[in-house]
């Protein structure tokens, strides 16, 4: 069953009528509803084109958070082979919010790291809704160290509202773990390609997104804080999240114009959740092209370019 967002009500109404007509035809084969169904499907396409061509920042945030949007595990299954996940930080415990390990991409050995939100109640609790604790970032550091040691390109997939802000996480050094992970991303002498596939929230995102190439899916968002959090801080009113989202410049178009990201991966009309295979394939093509380009550079050059890239962002914004 499709989960509709608030602004998708016209689409919901039309698709509801299509379902009713198909059910009616199934119950009585003498009734021909094909012409009406075709007409309604055409109206659905027109409605989606109209709605998705003018999404505002808050609506894009809702699309980025859609529960049926493809997650890290979907990309891992479709784009990579021989994925061998690594677990634990060798200091405290395992954190399933971050998935990381070794795999092959188009036959090439790589390291992959990403946040996983889960797709049902059980898996969301297991993965802590994609909000990593220090152990997750220290696991990412382990994989980055392995990649550097064995000269493996790194692919990171970002999808988190932010790092977990719990007391235990803070007591175990959340800030230090995020800083160390960011530092490791900046220091390794291998290519890093990062893609924001959903939400890119705060330091929890940047900790694994400090890549030589950074891309965003068309309807993903990337920001220092959630719109609700920004509204609560600025105006003491979380209901002004829509206003905050607009002012924060969190969309892929905003960030491309600001020079924060290198490119935008188009999504089908209706969002990635409507055609996940199409989006995953397009993402794979972008990653492949970026890795092919970056493979021509030396390790020293890769590290220097990556550092300069993020220094320039800090100086120019």
From Swiss-Prot:
Pathway assignment: Lipid metabolism; malonyl-CoA biosynthesis; malonyl-CoA from acetyl-CoA: step 1/1
Keywords: ATP-binding, Cytoplasm, Fatty acid biosynthesis, Fatty acid metabolism, Lipid biosynthesis, Lipid metabolism, Nucleotide-binding, Transferase
Stored Pfam families: ACCA
Domain annotation CoA carboxyltransferase C-terminal: ranges: 39-293
Keyword tRNA processing included in the entry's annotation: no
Gene3D superfamilies assigned to the protein according to its UniProt record, in alphabetical order: 2-enoyl-CoA Hydratase, Chain A, domain 1
Cleaved signal peptide residues: none
PROSITE patterns documented for this protein: COA_CT_CTER (PS50989)
Protein location: Cytoplasm
GO cellular component: acetyl-CoA carboxylase complex
Superkingdom, taxonomy of origin: Bacteria
PANTHER family with a match to the protein in the record: ACETYL-COENZYME A CARBOXYLASE CARBOXYL TRANSFERASE SUBUNIT ALPHA, ACETYL-COENZYME A CARBOXYLASE CARBOXYL TRANSFERASE SUBUNIT ALPHA, CHLOROPLASTIC
The family this protein is said to belong to: Belongs to the AccA family.
UniProt protein name: Acetyl-coenzyme A carboxylase carboxyl transferase subunit alpha
Gene name, Swiss-Prot/TrEMBL: accA
């Amino acid at each position: 069953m499709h989960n509709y967002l608030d602004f998708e009500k016209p689409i919901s109404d039309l698709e509801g009528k299509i379902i009713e007509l198909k059910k009616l035809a199934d119950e009585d084969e003498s009734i021909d509803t094909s012409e009406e169904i075709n007409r309604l499907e055409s109206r659905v396409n027109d409605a989606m084109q109209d709605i998705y061509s003018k999404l505002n920042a808050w609506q894009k945030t809702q699309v980025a958070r859609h529960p049926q949007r493809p997650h890290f595990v979907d990309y891992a299954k479709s784009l990579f082979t021989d994925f061998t996940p690594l677990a634990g930080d060798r200091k405290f415990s395992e954190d399933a919010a971050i998935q990381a390990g070794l795999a092959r991409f188009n036959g090439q050995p790589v390291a992959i790291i990403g946040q996983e939100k889960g797709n049902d109640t059980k898996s969301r609790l297991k993965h802590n809704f994609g909000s990593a604790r220090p152990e997750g970032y220290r696991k990412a550091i382990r994989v980055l160290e392995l990649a550097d040691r064995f000269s493996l390109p790194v692919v990171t997939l970002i999808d988190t509202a932010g790092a977990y802000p719990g007391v235990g996480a803070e007591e175990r050094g959340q800030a230090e773990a995020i800083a160390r992970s960011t530092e490791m991303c900046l220091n390794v002498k291998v290519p890093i390609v990062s893609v924001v596939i959903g939400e890119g929230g705060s330091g929890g995102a940047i900790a694994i997104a400090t890549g030589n190439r950074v891309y965003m899916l068309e309807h993903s968002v990337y920001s220092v804080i959630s719109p609700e959090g920004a509204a609560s801080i600025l105006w003491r009113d979380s209901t002004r999240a829509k206003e905050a989202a607009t002012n924060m410049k969190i969309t892929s178009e905003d960030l491309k114009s600001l020079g924060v990201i290198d490119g935008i991966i188009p999504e089908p009309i209706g969002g990635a959740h409507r055609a996940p295979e199409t989006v995953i394939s397009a993402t794979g093509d972008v990653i492949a092209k970026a890795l092919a380009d970056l493979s021509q550079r030396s390790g020293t050059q890769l590290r220097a370019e990556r550092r300069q890239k993020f220094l320039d962002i800090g100086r120019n914004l």
